[in-house]
């Protein structure tokens, strides 16, 4: 059970079926991403922390998702090209997945089971704004929006879940 997250089958953005076992012993920040979202500039911060902490075994893993207002409509090739050319993304990207609902990817089933609620910036109001726009999660533990983050420790266990508006460079994320 200890490394069940790492044993989960995933598909890279280039179509290779693999597991996350090659990241064993590393700290992971797993993020559902989208290219046409107001939070898309977080790609830059994700890349910054990836570069800053890579030599200490830190890796960002991006999982595109089109479940939130269709904000990731492109093909894997389009996503890969956009992320590299617009944001300089070099961290590992994976094939588009569902993070909520009946087709929720097994990785996200495990992540959510380990961390059913997200830490949010104090008084951010992000959740309330989403609710006011009719974007209430179907279930309390659902991913709220693009760029929700899961920090996974070197032992393969989820350490914390962060809300979409908790930026990757937020001191709370960095101190965790």
Positions of predicted regions on the chain:
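A short, polar/charged loop-to-alpha-helix boundary motif
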Residues: 168-176
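Short, thiol/selenol-centered motifs that function as redox-active sites or metal-ligating centers
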Residues: 23, 34-46, 63-73, 149, ...
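Thiol/selenol-based redox catalytic cores and closely related redox-interacting motifs
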Residues: 82-167
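N-terminal "domain-start" segment that seeds a small globular fold
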Residues: 1-21, 39-41, 118
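Conserved helix-turn-beta segment immediately C-terminal to the redox Cys motif
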Residues: 26-28, 35-36, 40-64, 83-87
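Thiol-based oxidoreductase modules, predominantly thioredoxin-like and allied folds used
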Residues: 32, 54-76, 89-101
């Amino acid at each position: 059970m200890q490394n069940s997250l790492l044993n989960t089958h995933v598909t890279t953005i280039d179509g290779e079926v693999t597991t996350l076992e090659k990241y064993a012993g590393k700290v992971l920040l797993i993020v559902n991403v989208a290219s046409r979202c107001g939070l898309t500039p977080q790609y830059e911060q994700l890349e910054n922390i990836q570069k800053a902490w890579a030599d200490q075994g830190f890796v960002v893993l991006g999982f595109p998702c089109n479940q939130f207002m269709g904000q990731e409509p492109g093909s894997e090739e389009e996503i890969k090209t956009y992320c590299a050319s617009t944001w300089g993304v070099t961290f590992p990207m994976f094939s588009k997945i569902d993070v909520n609902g009946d087709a929720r990817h097994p990785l996200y089933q495990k992540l959510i089971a380990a961390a059913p609620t997200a830490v949010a910036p104090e008084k951010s109001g992000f959740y309330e704004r989403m609710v006011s726009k009719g974007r209430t999660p179907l279930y309390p533990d659902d991913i709220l929006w693009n760029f929700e983050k899961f920090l996974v420790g070197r032992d393969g266990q989820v350490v914390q879940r962060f809300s979409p508006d908790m930026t990757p460079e937020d001191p709370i994320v960095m101190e965790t």
